[in-house]
Amino acid sequence: MAIHGLVKNNLVECVSSTTYQAASGGGAKHMRELLTQTGKIYNRVDSLLAQDSSNILDIDSKVLDTQKNFSGNEMHCFKVPLAGSLIPWIDQDRNDGWSLEEWKGDVELNKILGSDK
């Protein structure tokens, strides 16, 4: 990694990283949930999208309203609306302020850098 030399020479105090996970990483049921939500949103606004004169804020309002009203069955895997969203906390809660995904990233980075932190 490009940062290794900086870390080795004690020139880095802290590293912050961000990862983005795809719904497909959870398998077919997660993809089905995403596509179901996306379809429901599209069906709610398709007539407005076809009109060049429609107000984008009206479209956005309908999208948000649709997301807020997804049923429990439509949010079974992620427990929150996935379509049109970024979910900041994925995987299991380790009960130490870290998700399992964050912990794995930290462990892997330290392994690559040869750090015992």
Where in this protein do the model-derived segments appear?
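Active-site-lining helix/loop region of Rossmann-like oxidoreductase modules
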Residues: 1-117
